[in-house]
Structures are given as structure tokens and as C-alpha cells.
């Protein structure tokens, strides 16, 4: 290197800047694009980088000509030419080398090139060298391959061939770090190989970062294949190469807040800065500059301090409060306000007057309560409130402080007292003054904000701003933050967006790379958070915005969850009429009307067809019903209604009837009941809940809402008709679902036979579709039995039947073939404190009955375990029989005459399987139809229930029938009769002996044959009755005996009819006859499992013998929940657990 030093170092005697000035006349004017005195001083750049010993006049001339040549070379490279960009000087000798010894200069095509003299490994570094690099201005226009060039540096480094980052031919990198240049090889260079470099500036980050990191220059290109960008990210990534990596900060000197972007600072100055002036009108020529001067100059005489904002000036004025006037004012001076030409007589008055200009409440508008500093501004503002007032002129809008004052805030720091009068003299007219002042504001704002980035000059003007006071809800300028996506468009009208401040897309400048990367990362995090769910293309998408705006209530939420809660509970649109939108066609056009619970109705109105209409063609759709016990309570023993109960019942029933007359919020056409109605919940496309006025995006979400969260879950049960039921085939089977399991096997509608209508509570036909015109009107006292207890000292806890329990089929659902199913499917909230016993439970209930929730609603059998329940439903329940066998044909005799069988002791004996305890107590049927004979009338521990509650099923032929009426046990409370006066009426001797279970086998043919026989049971040696051979099972071949909870149950397979879910709850038939019970449950023997299959004859006999020998297990405590395996120490906690917390409610529709 020493032998290549400059041979004549003392050739340069004159200053470096003089040499450049001499050569400027010969250099083209484009030189200033690269070398500018304003960008960097020549003394600092050239004199320190090029010493006198290594710079000659020829080299200065070469460097001067280099600027134009580089611009031409850059354009050539943009056209695809990859040749070197620096034209060499043919007269330059190789002995002027100033670079490292491993390199040398050579001539190629008349240009100076740098090559290696020896083999160089990867990572060979030379430096540091003084120098400077800048953006290539031509590359921004022509998209050249070289975005950066060296504007100063050692001569040998300037001769290096430059290539773009994406070009894989480069073998070294020249970068700037700490204000110095370094050169490092990125590939192994062989001897004689040319150096091809690219430039990276690590200091100012003005580089093509994406080009460097995503190409083979520094990183392998195969990394691009593993990067998946969203469409929005790809668009943002396309502008990253030209984005500005912002390392500058933008402070607000008034508030002391630093902002990372100019946009944020501009918004702060316009809306949030404490030193801003909100509503100021244009001032006149003589005092227009004073409004600006007050924010920088102290108005006190002989005080030359200047401040950047009004807050600093206000704090400064406090220092003058204690100063006396004579200390301040020279002789002949006066205190004159520079804002309004007010002359004060004392310092105190002048001080108070100045504060009136600084406060916003000096002159306040009575209409909008905006404050103004001068009365003239207030008067001009009040013109806007005049109805016939003219709109503000464009010139007035240009003079508004939002255009001048706020834009001037950053620039006032650079203003001095001498500059302000010059700007005042330049304003001759009003329009000219506004234009000049605005332009000067913008220029000084740019000078203040971009003094560290001279290459960026945003060319904003007054058209970029909009100062119109328009209250609108625009879509966010940020694509990732607006609920109105630009590629979809809003589904609601949105006002025009008039930006109050300029955004980066409004300013012709390069966007900030930090904001682009922030938006890209925001998209990624939002995608990860919300997943790839499908949303309707209205407002929401998988890229959910951070916040949302309710346009009805004019509220913007920064959290989407808060917005959804608002729309569900608080939005005003929930109570307004809403039109159907094409996106959600199922939205009702009219909101459901509010129902008044005080609507008066009578007991006759409850039964008329106008209040209750049903659709016989659509069994799945039922209208409202009333409880059978309601009418009995209303009528009373003497035919007088109870006023208190009547008002309560009427309120509940009127609400339910009005509610159920509407299907999906639309009135039902009661004049034409034959028109089939569409079940809204069974519609797979339904997504709107009329009760809550919520439209869901998916039907599955809607179904979950209806099952767990709908407001109708908390309504009285009569308001929840069968139309609110979820279709059985649309729900998944759950093991703990006790009341809805049979829905999985419901037959099709066409398989259900027609139904014979029954009268309602023996009331004469009142033109109601629920009552039969062929039935005579009889007394209520002969049809129903009293509900009473015969245990001494035990009082029934709930004698009154509550309307909240709705297990029975009410009136107007009785004329459809699915009425009994609707009875069982009623969504009744479980209220154990008011739970009354069903018929089968009353037959077998003792004071220590077990509260169990695995109950077959068809057979009225409770189970202790889920496995027993499932085995019963799969193998033994009559409802499931149609899945294995064809439907049996209906018997000609629809309703048999069970009265003869009931009155025949012979039949009741032969059709019964008597189970005895070891004590030898025997029950025998009495000929008069009562429960006990006279010698058994004194037995203790027996509980009397009505015979109507014992009717679980009827004859085999009756299994084909679907009885339409379910009489609730409370319905017999008011009944009268001579027979019912007996304390033991309703209990047969074959039903109970010490809690043993007896199952009546009822076959109608055998009952007719045995009608005239009256055999008597004889006591055997073991104390049990001697049974006839044919009277023990007496089962048809298609039936099986099943041990259920310690008792026997008959199971009929082939002749079962699927429509017999409500047999167990029918207390009466035609001609007012009673049906004998054939099955009941025994909760005392509650731990035996259900037989999973059809037992053989031997198994049947052994099972019967086991029941006869009294092998039932002892009962467990009633305070133990088997489902949850929890033992409670008191009944109150147990009831609370069952009501609210038990796991049996997991599949229910109520809590």
C-alpha cells in the first residue's frame, strides 16, 4: 500500500470547497441530487474523508462528474443492465491506489474496477473508512436495483461494482455502522475475481430490508416457501421495501408526550393537546398575528420571554401576579392587550384580562356550550345555529384555528419575534393572508418534524384536511381495525367519511415500516385468536376487528365482547321494528308484541277454540294447554270459583295463551286450523330467536342458545309450548338425558294412527276441539278420587298443584296425534320444592321414597343407575318396540270396559302376581272394588292414592292407543263421592304389603273369561297366597317378565305401538270406566338392575320367586344423590342441590 501512495501530496494547497466551486460550472446541475450542501456540510464530509495526501485535482474533478454518471448508470441498471455503474477515467493510473493491499484496481471496458489479488475467505473485512451513504433518488422513481449509493468515501470503495441485493452475483457488502464504512466479503473470492458489492445502512435503517433478508444475498431463498402471508399481509409486504423505518420521535412540547409517528402527533395536536384552541374564528388583518403571538410572547411590557403554548404562558403569567405596576411600567407606558386592544389601568386588571383570553370559557355559546376567546368569535359561531343561517364559507373554514392554530403548534417553536412581523406584512387581503399563513405553517411544520429526514418532504396542502363538523360513523382508515371491511362493504348505511386529520395514505409520502409491520402482526394475532371459523359475510370475518361500533346507539366499543353484550342486552334496536335483511331472511319483520300478564280471561275462555287452536295436520306443532287441576280448582266443590286462585291462574294462563298463539312471533290463523304451520325450531336454517331478538350466524349456535341461554327458559312453563322443542334427530344422545331419550326413536308422522278424542274432565263439549261431542256430561265427583294421606301424623306437604308443573297434557293440545308426546316433552323447570308425585309414584310411594331422576317417562319407572335406564330404553320400553317389529294392527275395540274387571275380584286375583313378605300378610281384592277387605282395613303404613293415579297401562289392545289426556294427580283433589270417603279407597289389597311391588297382568281376553269367576286365594304354609297355575304368569308369548327395581314388569315386543307414551297418565276412558293398573314402581327395592334381555321361562319363574320371597333390598337415605355421589346431611341442601347443581340437569333445558 505504501508504494501506491500519492507521489506528490503537496499538490493540493487550496481549500477543498474552493476546488469544488471552481468545478461546479462544468458539472451538471443534477449533481445536487447526490451531493448537497444542505444535506451535509462540505467541510465535514470531504475535508475529513479525503486528506491532502490522497486527493488530487483530477480526483476532485472525477468525483464531481461521478454524480451524473451514477444517475445514468442507475437508469441503465433498471432496464436490466447489470454492468457497473461508475464510469472510469481512462487517464487514471494504477499507482494511485489507496485501498487495501489484498485488492487492486483494473480497467474493464474503460471503467475502473476492483478485483482481488489473492484468495479471500468469507468474512474478510476492511475498515473503518470515513464515508456517507444515502438513498438513491433515481431508484425511487425508476425502481432501480440499487436503492442506496455511496455519496462519500475512499476512492477505491467508490470504484467497486454495485449490484442490487436480489442479485446473487454480489460477493461483498459495504455497510455503514457508527458513521463509518465497512466492507466485508460474503463469499469466498478467488484471485483475480471482481468485487461486486451491495450497500446497507445500519444506522438510519434506510434500506431494503425485505430484499436483503429474503434473497440469496444474506439468507437462502428457500425460506420464502415456508412463509405464508395473508392477502392483507402480502399487500403490506409489497410496500415494505420502500417503507421508512422510523427511528425518529415526534414530541409534543406542550404535554411532554413523545409519539412514534407524525400522524399520532398531528392527531394529538388537533384534538388532545392542552395548548390547543378549539373553536376560534378567523381574525382580522390588524390582529390576526396577535392570536399566534399570545402563544409565544409574554404581553407584559419589558418581558421578552416567548413560550410555545398557552399553558406555558399561563404559568409564566403567574409570576407577574405579585409585581407592582410602578416596578414594571416606564413613564408614559400603558397596559394594552395585544389580542383585543384592551388597555388596562392596573397590572391586576390586565392580568385578569389576559387570563380571559387563555381560558375557553371567556365567551360561551348557549346552544352548544363551546367557549371562545373573543366576542367576535362567539357571534360568528352563533350564526351557525340560526336555521336560515348561511353555511360557513370556504375561506372561513381555511381561517379556522383547526387549520392554522393547530397546524402552527409545531412550527411556533421555531418562530422568533422578528419573524412574526414579516409574516404579518405579507398579508394584504383576507384570502391571500390565509393562503400564505397556511403554506408557511405547513412548511415550518415539515421543517420541524422532518429536520432529521431531509429526504422526505410530504407535500400536504389545505385540500388534505377537512374541517367540516360532521358526526358520522366511518370505516376506519386502518384496514385491520374497521368492522366495515373494504372488500365487502357495509350492510348498513354509513355517512361520508371526512377525515379530521391526514392519514399516511392521504399524504404523498412513503409509509412507515413500523406501522406496516404492526398491522401485519395484528392480522396474525387476530387470526390465531379467532381461528378459521366461518362467519356470515356481513360485518364479521375470521379477521375480527379489535372493536366495533353500534350505529344505532352511536357507541364505539374497543372490545368486541363488549359490543356483543351491548347488542344482546342494551341496544335500542332490540325494541325497534327491524326490516328483513337479505343476509338474514329469517329475521321477523315485526318485533313480538309485549304480553301483558293482566289480560283477563275466564274459565270458559280457556276452553274456547279462539284462544286455543291446534293443527291436526302437524302433530309436532302444539298450541297452548291448561292443566287439568286448574279447572277443578276454579270450579271448586260448590261450583264457586276461588277468587284468589282464579286471578293467579288466569294471569298465568292468559300469558301463555297469548304467547302460544304466535308461532315465531307471528299470529296463528285460528280461523283455518288445518293450515300446517312450520315449526321454527325444527327448521335447520333458522338462526333468529324471536324471544331474545338475536340473530345468530349459524344454526348450531342458535340451537345452543335456545337450549341453555334463551330468555324463554325462565318464563312460566305454560308459555313454553312444544313448538320450542328441539327436534329429536338434531340432538346427540346423552347418557344422562332422562326425559328426552325416547325422542330418538319416535316414528314418522305417517306411522301414527289417528286418535280418538276424549272429553276433558267430563266437562260438556264447549265447541272445543279438545272435548268430544259424543260424551255425556257427568258429575265430577264420580270421576275423581280425593287425594289424602292415611298416615297418622303425616301431613301432605303440597296439596295444591302448582302451575309450574306441567307434566299433564293441557286442553288444546289434545286433538292432535302427538298430544301425549307434547305432554311428556313439555320443558318444565324442575322445582323440587313444589314437585308433586306422578301416578305411578303415588301408587308405590312411602314416606322414605327415593328422589331419583332416571325415570322412563313412558313407563313411569325410575332407575337408580344410568345403565339400568339405558338397558330399559333399549330392550324393554314399549316405545322402542317399533324399531324391532312391525306395527301391530289396531284392535277393533278401542277402549275396553275395564269396569267389569275392576269390580271382579276373581279377575284381579288371577291377573295379579302377589308378592308376600315372610310374615304371611295377605291382600285380597274385595268384590266392591275397594282396596281392602274389612279385616284389612286397620293395616298401618298404607298410603291411599286415587285409583286414577294407579293407571299405568291398560289391556294389550290399549297399548295400541294413544290416550290424549293426562290427568295430573292434583286434579282429583276436589273430587267427591260416597266411595271416596273411605280412607282406604284407591288401594287394592294386591298392591302393597310392607312396600312390596305387585304387577297386574292385564289381558283383556282372559279378563272376559274370568269375569264371572271368583276364586279365593288361600294362605300357604309360608304365608303366601296359593296361586293357580295359570294365574301366576298368565303372560302371552310375546311378553316377558322383567325385574325392575325389585318388581316385575311386563314387556310387550311385537304388538307394541310407538304411540303409547302417555298411557300411564290416563285416569279414565269412555263411559267413565276405570282402568286397572298393570305396573308400578317400588322405590324401596331400588338397587336391583334391569334384566338386559328377554328372560326364559326358568328365568322368569326364578325372578318371580325371588320377588315372592321378598328379596328386595333395604332403601338408602333419601338425602343421597346417586348421580353426583354426594350425601347430604339435611333435606334442604339436598333439594337445593337437585334443583340447581345436580348433574342430571346437564341435558335439560333448564338450570
From Swiss-Prot:
Residues 401-410, 419-431, 447-485, 647-658, 1057-1067 have a biased composition (Polar residues). Zn(2+) 5 binds at residues 1121, 1124, 1137, 1142. GO terms for biological process: cell differentiation; embryonic organ development; fat cell differentiation; gonadal mesoderm development; heart development; in utero embryonic development; lung development; negative regulation of DNA-templated transcription. It is found in: Nucleus. Zn(2+) 3 binds at residues 689, 692, 705, 710. It comes from the Eukaryota. The keyword Acetylation does not apply. Residues 1-102, 389-487, 636-683, 1051-1095 are annotated as: Disordered. Its main location: nucleus. InterPro entries: FOG, ZF_CCHC_FOG, ZFPM1/2_PR, Znf_C2H2_sf, Znf_C2H2_type. The CCHC FOG-type zinc fingers 1, 2, 3 and 5 directly bind to GATA-type zinc fingers. The Tyr residue adjacent to the last Cys of the CCHC FOG-type zinc finger is essential for the interaction with GATA-type zinc fingers. Transcription regulator that plays a central role in heart morphogenesis and development of coronary vessels from epicardium, by regulating genes that are essential during cardiogenesis. Essential cofactor that acts via the formation of a heterodimer with transcription factors of the GATA family GATA4, GATA5 and GATA6. Such heterodimer can both activate or repress transcriptional activity, depending on the cell and promoter context. Also required in gonadal differentiation, possibly be regulating expression of SRY. Probably acts a corepressor of NR2F2. This is Zinc finger protein ZFPM2. It comes from Homo sapiens (Human). The gene is ZFPM2.
Amino acid at each position: 500500500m505504501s508504494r501506491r501512495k500519492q507521489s506528490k501530496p503537496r499538490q493540493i494547497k487550496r481549500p477543498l470547497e474552493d476546488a469544488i466551486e471552481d468545478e461546479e460550472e462544468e458539472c451538471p446541475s443534477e449533481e445536487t441530487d447526490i451531493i448537497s450542501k444542505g444535506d451535509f456540510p462540505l467541510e465535514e464530509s470531504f475535508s475529513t474523508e479525503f486528506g491532502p495526501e490522497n486527493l488530487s485535482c483530477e480526483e476532485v474533478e472525477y468525483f464531481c462528474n461521478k454524480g451524473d454518471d451514477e444517475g445514468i448508470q442507475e437508469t441503465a441498471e433498471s432496464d436490466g443492465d447489470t454492468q457497473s455503474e461508475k464510469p472510469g477515467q481512462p487517464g487514471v493510473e494504477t499507482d494511485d491506489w489507496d485501498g487495501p493491499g489484498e485488492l487492486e484496481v483494473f480497467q474493464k471496458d474503460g471503467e475502473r474496477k476492483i478485483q482481488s489479488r489473492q484468495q479471500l475467505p468469507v468474512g474478510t473485512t476492511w475498515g473503518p473508512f470515513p464515508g456517507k451513504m444515502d438513498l438513491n433518488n433515481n431508484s425511487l422513481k425508476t425502481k432501480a436495483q440499487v436503492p442506496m449509493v455511496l455519496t462519500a468515501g475512499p476512492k477505491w470503495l467508490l470504484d467497486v461494482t454495485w449490484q442490487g441485493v436480489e442479485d446473487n452475483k454480489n460477493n461483498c457488502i459495504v455497510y455503514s455502522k457508527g458513521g463509518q464504512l465497512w466492507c466485508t466479503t460474503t463469499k469466498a473470492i478467488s484471485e483475480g475475481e471482481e468485487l461486486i458489492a451491495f450497500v446497507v445502512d445500519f444506522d438510519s435503517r434506510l434500506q431494503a430490508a425485505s430484499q436483503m433478508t429474503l434473497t440469496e444475498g444474506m439468507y437462502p431463498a428457500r425460506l420464502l416457501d415456508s412463509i405464508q402471508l395473508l392477502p392483507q399481509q402480502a399487500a403490506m409486504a409489497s410496500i415494505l421495501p420502500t417503507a421508512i423505518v422510523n427511528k425518529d420521535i415526534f414530541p409534543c412540547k406542550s404535554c411532554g408526550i413523545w409519539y412514534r409517528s407524525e400522524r399520532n402527533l398531528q392527531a394529538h395536536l388537533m384534538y388532545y393537546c392542552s395548548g390547543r384552541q378549539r373553536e376560534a374564528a378567523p381574525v382580522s388583518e390588524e390582529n390576526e398575528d396577535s392570536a399566534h403571538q399570545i402563544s409565544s410572547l409574554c404581553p407584559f411590557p419589558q418581558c421578552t420571554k416567548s413560550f410555545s403554548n398557552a399553558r406555558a404562558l399561563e404559568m409564566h403569567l403567574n409570576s407577574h401576579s405579585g409585581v407592582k405596576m410602578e416596578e414594571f411600567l416606564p413613564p408614559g407606558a400603558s397596559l394594552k392587550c395585544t389580542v383585543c386592544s384592551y388597555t388596562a389601568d392596573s397590572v391586576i386588571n390586565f392580568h385578569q384580562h389576559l387570563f380571559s383570553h387563555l381560558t375557553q370559557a371567556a365567551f360561551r355559546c348557549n346552544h352548544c356550550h363551546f367557549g371562545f376567546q373573543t366576542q367576535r368569535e362567539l357571534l360568528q359561531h352563533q350564526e351557525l345555529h340560526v336555521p336560515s343561517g348561511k353555511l360557513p364559507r370556504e375561506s372561513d373554514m381555511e381561517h379556522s384555528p383547526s387549520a392554522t392554530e393547530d397546524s402552527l403548534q409545531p412550527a411556533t417553536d421555531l418562530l422568533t419575534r422578528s419573524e412574526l412581523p414579516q409574516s404579518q406584512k405579507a398579508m394584504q387581503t383576507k384570502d391571500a393572508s390565509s393562503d400564505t399563513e397556511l403554506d408557511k405553517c405547513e412548511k415550518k411544520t415539515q421543517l420541524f418534524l422532518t429536520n432529521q429526514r431531509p429526504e422526505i418532504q410530504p407535500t400536504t396542502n389545505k385540500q388534505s384536511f377537512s374541517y367540516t363538523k360532521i358526526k358520522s360513523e366511518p370505516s376506519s382508515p386502518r384496514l385491520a381495525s374497521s368492522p366495515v371491511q373494504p372488500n365487502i362493504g357495509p350492510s348498513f348505511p354509513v355517512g361520508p367519511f371526512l377525515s379530521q386529520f391526514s392519514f399516511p395514505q392521504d399524504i404523498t409520502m412513503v409509509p412507515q415500516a413500523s406501522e406496516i409491520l404492526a398491522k401485519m402482526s395484528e392480522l396474525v394475532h387476530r387470526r390465531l385468536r379467532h381461528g378459521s371459523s366461518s362467519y356470515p359475510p356481513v360485518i364479521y370475518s375470521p379477521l375480527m376487528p379489535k372493536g366495533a361500533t353500534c350505529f344505532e346507539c352511536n357507541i364505539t366499543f374497543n372490545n368486541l365482547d363488549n359490543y356483543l353484550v351491548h347488542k344482546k342486552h342494551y341496544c335500542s334496536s332490540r325494541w325497534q321494528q327491524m326490516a328483513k335483511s337479505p343476509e338474514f331472511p329469517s329475521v321477523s319483520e315485526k318485533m313480538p308484541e309485549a304480553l301483558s300478564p293482566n289480560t283477563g280471561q275466564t274459565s270458559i275462555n280457556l276452553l274456547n277454540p279462539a284462544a286455543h287452536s291446534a293443527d291436526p295436520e302437524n302433530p309436532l306443532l302444539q298450541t297452548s294447554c291448561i292443566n287439568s287441576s286448574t279447572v277443578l280448582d276454579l270450579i271448586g266443590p260448590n261450583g264457586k270459583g276461588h277468587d284468589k286462585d282464579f286471578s293467579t291462574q288466569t294471569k298465568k294462563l292468559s300469558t301463555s295463551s297469548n304467547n302460544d298463539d304466535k308461532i315465531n312471533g307471528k299470529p296463528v290463523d285460528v280461523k283455518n286450523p288445518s293450515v300446517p304451520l312450520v315449526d321454527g325450531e325444527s327448521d335447520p336454517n333458522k338462526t333468529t330467536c324471536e324471544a331474545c331478538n338475536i340473530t345468530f350466524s349459524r344454526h348450531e349456535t342458535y340451537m345452543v342458545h335456545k337450549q341453555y341461554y334463551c330468555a324463554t327458559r325462565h318464563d312460566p312453563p305454560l308459555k313454553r309450548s312444544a313448538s320450542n322443542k328441539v327436534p329429536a334427530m338434531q340432538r346427540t344422545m346423552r347418557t344422562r338425558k332422562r326425559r328426552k331419550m325416547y325422542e330418538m326413536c319416535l316414528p314418522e308422522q305417517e306411522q301414527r294412527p289417528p286418535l280418538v278424542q276424549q272429553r276433558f274432565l267430563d266437562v260438556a263439549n264447549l265447541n272445543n276441539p279438545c272435548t268430544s261431542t259424543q260424551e255425556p256430561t257427568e258429575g265430577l265427583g264420580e270421576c275423581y278420587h280425593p287425594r289424602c294421606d292415611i298416615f297418622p301424623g303425616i301431613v301432605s306437604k303440597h296439596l295444591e298443584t302448582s302451575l309450574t308443573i306441567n307434566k299433564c297434557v293441557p286442553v288444546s293440545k289434545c286433538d292432535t296425534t302427538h298430544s301425549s308426546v307434547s305432554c311428556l316433552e313439555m320443558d318444565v323447570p324442575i322445582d323440587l320444592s313444589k314437585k308433586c308425585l306422578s301416578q305411578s309414584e303415588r301408587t308405590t310411594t312411602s314416606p322414605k321414597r327415593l328422589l331419583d331422576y332416571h325415570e322412563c317417562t313412558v313407563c313411569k319407572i325410575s332407575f337408580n343407575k344410568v345403565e339400568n335406564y339405558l338397558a330399559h330404553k333399549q330392550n324393554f320400553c314399549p316405545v322402542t318396540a317399533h324399531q324391532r317389529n312391525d306395527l301391530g294392527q289396531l284392535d277393533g275395540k278401542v277402549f275396553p270396559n275395564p269396569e267389569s274387571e275392576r269390580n271382579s275380584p276373581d279377575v284381579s286375583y288371577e291377573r295379579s302376581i302377589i308378592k308376600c313378605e315372610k310374615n304371611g300378610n295377605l291382600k285380597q281384592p274385595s268384590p266392591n272394588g275397594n282396596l281392602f277387605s274389612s279385616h284389612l282395613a286397620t293395616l298401618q303404613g298404607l298410603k291411599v292414592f286415587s285409583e286414577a293415579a294407579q293407571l299405568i297401562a291398560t289391556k294389550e289392545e290399549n297399548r295400541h292407543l294413544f290416550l290424549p289426556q293426562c290427568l295430573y294427580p292434583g286434579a282429583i283433589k276436589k273430587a267427591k263421592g260416597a266411595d271416596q270417603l273411605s280412607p282406604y279407597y284407591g288401594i287394592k289389597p294386591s298392591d302393597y304389603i310392607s312396600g312390596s311391588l305387585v304387577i297386574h297382568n292385564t289381558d283383556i281376553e282372559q279378563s272376559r273369561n274370568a269375569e264371572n269367576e271368583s276364586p279365593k286365594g288361600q294362605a300357604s304354609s309360608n304365608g303366601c297366597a296359593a296361586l293357580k297355575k295359570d294365574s301366576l304368569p298368565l303372560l302371552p308369548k310375546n311378553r316377558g317378565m322383567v325385574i325392575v327395581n325389585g318388581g316385575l314388569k311386563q314387556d310387550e315386543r311385537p304388538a307394541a305401538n310407538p304411540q303409547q307414551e302417555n298411557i300411564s297418565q290416563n285416569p279414565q276412558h269412555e263411559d267413565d270406566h276405570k282402568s286397572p293398573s298393570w305396573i308400578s314402581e317400588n322405590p324401596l327395592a331400588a338397587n336391583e338392575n334391569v334384566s338386559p334381555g328377554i328372560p326364559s321361562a326358568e328365568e322368569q319363574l326364578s325372578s318371580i320367586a325371588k320377588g315372592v320371597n321378598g328379596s328386595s333390598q333395604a332403601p338408602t337415605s333419601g338425602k343421597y344423590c346417586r348421580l353426583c355421589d354426594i350425601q347430604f346431611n339435611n333435606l334442604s341442601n339436598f333439594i337445593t342441590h337437585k334443583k340447581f347443581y345436580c348433574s342430571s340437569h346437564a341435558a335439560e333445558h333448564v338450570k
